[in-house]
């Protein structure tokens, strides 16, 4: 935003004619103000990233100048000629209105000239050394100022006690939790340009890669990656069905001239994809909240319907800085499982919050991930409902079989839409957290979006709403699993592998020669008929090469069939989960025993078909 200050003996203006971008209801069409500070303002395109912070930062600048000049009358005058890269009209009006409101709250007499009108004005500058000044407010500086306003306190909850983090010997904490604490305190170790392990793995395993012809942070998924994503998506949707959640689909783009949409976007405070369509400022959603809340506002609800859950697998977008985009950890386009729960009151919300936090822990175990946890809350909520933290810690101990510390961030007052939230993070191979699931108690959106329910007396009330992603984005899930398997290999010497139910290929049949190919095909067809993702290595390659290739692809079960196996009617199966680099775990079993084992490891999980040729002689390699 560009600001031009004129300390004036007199300022008068008259709005004479509308332009096509004029605000519909101008605050005032003409005015004459004496002894005032005139603020000519141009809201710029970059300000659309965080209009709220820009408005607040601009008001700070105005207060600084007004204080020095001892001016208590302010004229806010939209003046597009101060900049070339102007914000959309909707955002500009939003910022100017917010500035007007903030100045009035701080005791100033404010006159705001209408936006988008041709106006005549007369100005008499006082002419002293400070009577003409200018300022530039940038989004970066505005966001930094916003963050500095409310300082949070960090504590560690362990052994039933809350201990200020500065009183804790970090060297005695578990390594992954220590990395989490240092990250939250801004003290994480330097990793330079070192690439996370999963970036190489996602390419090697033909899962996905960045698409060079697209915007940064947008990826293309290869057939194996598509299978993994579908398994994860169906897994979460099945969980939601078990919870009784209604599945919905909503648009990806929203109009920022809608007050509720704009205000909720401001609360997010991070970078957003914004698009202009004529004079309209539109935003690509960064989560499913916008569509979910608009849908709920049009839903007739009573107390007996609550708690009500609605779920969407949302394609979402965040305009991350290009230098911050890393592998699958931070993207500009991602797929987020989003659950929203409408609750009658805070008691019901807390009950649901704990149940959903437990669900996140259970999901992590299904994915082979153990999380470190940050509980974020206001002082008031922690004081009144400390049992929420205690029950969360108990749930972690039950899930992991041992007590784990919890990092607690306490805000002196609420600055977001949530009263409390819990974030679950997996620590990657470089010691950095990958934030995955989250549960939040939202105390603002019910009122903001006009969502109501009829209580037992028939009175309309605004609900408390929970936000929950039981996995985090599908991309980050895959990122965490790959990082976890790399750590498993580096720290324990165990071979990396995906859970069997997620593996693109669950079993591979390898005939040792042409003589046994027919028998190998029978085993292959039987496993395929049972619904498993199985392929047949029918290439004209040495057996050793075939086995090595299966290992490089992390195939959980490799079945080698030779003449001896055909004679005995058994299978020689290499079990990757139980193997190390030094020693392969091979077991002789019947086909029925292998089927039983695969059934156990995939029970209750999605059965997604293989979408590439199931004979390796016909399969291309995807990726660069």
Swiss-Prot record:
<keyword id="KW-0862">Zinc</keyword>
<dbReference type="InterPro" id="IPR006195">
    <property type="entry name" value="aa-tRNA-synth_II"/>
</dbReference>
<dbReference type="InterPro" id="IPR004154">
    <property type="entry name" value="Anticodon-bd"/>
</dbReference>
<dbReference type="Pfam" id="PF08915">
    <property type="entry name" value="tRNA-Thr_ED"/>
</dbReference>
<dbReference type="InterPro" id="IPR045864">
    <property type="entry name" value="aa-tRNA-synth_II/BPL/LPL"/>
</dbReference>
<feature type="binding site">
    <location>
        <position position="340"/>
    </location>
    <ligand>
        <name>Zn(2+)</name>
    </ligand>
</feature>
<dbReference type="InterPro" id="IPR015011">
    <property type="entry name" value="Threonyl-tRNA_syn_edit_dom_arc"/>
</dbReference>
<dbReference type="GO" id="GO:0005524">
    <property type="term" value="F:ATP binding"/>
</dbReference>
<dbReference type="InterPro" id="IPR023509">
    <property type="entry name" value="DTD-like_sf"/>
</dbReference>
<dbReference type="InterPro" id="IPR033728">
    <property type="entry name" value="ThrRS_core"/>
</dbReference>
<dbReference type="Pfam" id="PF03129">
    <property type="entry name" value="HGTP_anticodon"/>
</dbReference>
<dbReference type="GO" id="GO:0000049">
    <property type="term" value="F:tRNA binding"/>
</dbReference>
<dbReference type="Pfam" id="PF00587">
    <property type="entry name" value="tRNA-synt_2b"/>
</dbReference>
<protein>
    <recommendedName>
        <fullName>Threonine--tRNA ligase</fullName>
        <ecNumber>6.1.1.3</ecNumber>
    </recommendedName>
</protein>
<keyword id="KW-0030">Aminoacyl-tRNA synthetase</keyword>
<dbReference type="GO" id="GO:0006435">
    <property type="term" value="P:threonyl-tRNA aminoacylation"/>
</dbReference>
<feature type="binding site">
    <location>
        <position position="289"/>
    </location>
    <ligand>
        <name>Zn(2+)</name>
    </ligand>
</feature>
<dbReference type="InterPro" id="IPR036621">
    <property type="entry name" value="Anticodon-bd_dom_sf"/>
</dbReference>
<comment type="similarity">
    <text>Belongs to the class-II aminoacyl-tRNA synthetase family.</text>
</comment>
<keyword id="KW-0963">Cytoplasm</keyword>
<keyword id="KW-0067">ATP-binding</keyword>
<keyword id="KW-0694">RNA-binding</keyword>
<feature type="binding site">
    <location>
        <position position="467"/>
    </location>
    <ligand>
        <name>Zn(2+)</name>
    </ligand>
</feature>
<dbReference type="InterPro" id="IPR047246">
    <property type="entry name" value="ThrRS_anticodon"/>
</dbReference>
<dbReference type="GO" id="GO:0008270">
    <property type="term" value="F:zinc ion binding"/>
</dbReference>
<keyword id="KW-0648">Protein biosynthesis</keyword>
<keyword id="KW-0436">Ligase</keyword>
<feature type="region of interest" description="Disordered">
    <location>
        <begin position="598"/>
        <end position="624"/>
    </location>
</feature>
<keyword id="KW-0547">Nucleotide-binding</keyword>
<dbReference type="InterPro" id="IPR002320">
    <property type="entry name" value="Thr-tRNA-ligase_IIa"/>
</dbReference>
<keyword id="KW-0479">Metal-binding</keyword>
<feature type="region of interest" description="Editing domain">
    <location>
        <begin position="1"/>
        <end position="143"/>
    </location>
</feature>
<keyword id="KW-0820">tRNA-binding</keyword>
<comment type="subunit">
    <text>Homodimer.</text>
</comment>
<dbReference type="InterPro" id="IPR002314">
    <property type="entry name" value="aa-tRNA-synt_IIb"/>
</dbReference>
<comment type="function">
    <text>Catalyzes the attachment of threonine to tRNA(Thr) in a two-step reaction: L-threonine is first activated by ATP to form Thr-AMP and then transferred to the acceptor end of tRNA(Thr). Also edits incorrectly charged L-seryl-tRNA(Thr).</text>
</comment>
<feature type="region of interest" description="Catalytic">
    <location>
        <begin position="197"/>
        <end position="499"/>
    </location>
</feature>
<dbReference type="GO" id="GO:0004829">
    <property type="term" value="F:threonine-tRNA ligase activity"/>
</dbReference>
<dbReference type="GO" id="GO:0005737">
    <property type="term" value="C:cytoplasm"/>
</dbReference>
